[in-house]
């Protein structure tokens, strides 16, 4: 890896004596892992690795997968979660932040999300809480927001930093009102509802466009 920040990573892939530089237009270490897998698959099927690396540099995120919105000059990034492994990867990314940020979690237990939410106790929330003042505020939503609030309380988050916001439009406005970069971590159905709200009220394209 050459460099990495909250927007992208620059990496060099090596294959024997050959090297291929690419810009991964998504932050997070797990996106670098995905890019490595892409290069490996390309090599396995005999593709030109220079072409593969250039294609990686042209890649744009899918909806909800590190998708970025800017509202009133406040950047919001939506990061879909499905399980504790993926959630911990998101937290790994967040703990690299060097400026204060707002964090939002939208936890739902609809059929597409999975009914069992006990996995939130396998997520290293404590590591996030230990960031201190860098973790400026935590906003919670989704139909299981109360359980997520309990998880943060057990992790030691001061109560004054914790806020449950039931309505997704109110949640979006609360994220923007903090005037700091905001990272939103929704489960699948919460992501669809939240993204629809953002598109409708703030002029962004629907996810299928």
How would you name each of these model-derived features?
Residues 43-49, 54-63, 68-209:
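ATP-dependent carboxylate-amine ligase
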Residues 4, 16-18, 27-29, 83, ...:
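Generic structural motif
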Residues 1-21:
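Extended acidic/charged loop-beta regions that coordinate divalent cations
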Residues 20-57:
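A conserved, hydrophobic alpha-helical segment in the catalytic core
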Residues 9, 20, 37, 62-64:
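Structural beta-strand/beta-sheet cores of well-ordered domains, especially the beta-sheet scaffolds
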């Amino acid at each position: 890896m050459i460099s990495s920040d909250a927007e992208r990573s620059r990496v060099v892939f090596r294959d024997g004596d050959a090297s291929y530089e690419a810009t991964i237009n998504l932050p997070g270490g797990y996106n670098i892992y995905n890019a490595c897998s892409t290069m490996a698959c390309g090599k396995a099927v005999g593709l030109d690795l220079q072409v593969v690396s250039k294609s990686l540099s042209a890649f744009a995120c899918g909806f909800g997968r590190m998708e970025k919105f800017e509202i009133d000059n406040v950047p919001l990034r939506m990061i879909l979660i499905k399980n504790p492994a993926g959630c911990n990867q998101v937290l790994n990314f967040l703990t690299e932040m060097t400026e204060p940020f707002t964090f939002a979690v939208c936890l739902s237990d609809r059929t597409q999300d999975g009914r069992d939410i006990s996995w939130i106790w396998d997520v290293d929330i404590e590591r996030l809480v230990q960031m201190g003042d860098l973790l400026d505020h935590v906003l919670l939503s989704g139909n299981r927001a109360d359980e997520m609030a309990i998880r943060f309380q057990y992790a030691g988050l001061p109560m004054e930093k914790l806020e449950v916001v039931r309505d997704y439009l109110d949640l979006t406005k609360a994220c923007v009102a903090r005037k700091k970069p905001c990272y939103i971590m929704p489960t699948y159905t919460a992501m669809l509802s939240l993204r629809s709200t953002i598109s409708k009220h703030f002029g962004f394209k629907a996810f299928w466009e």
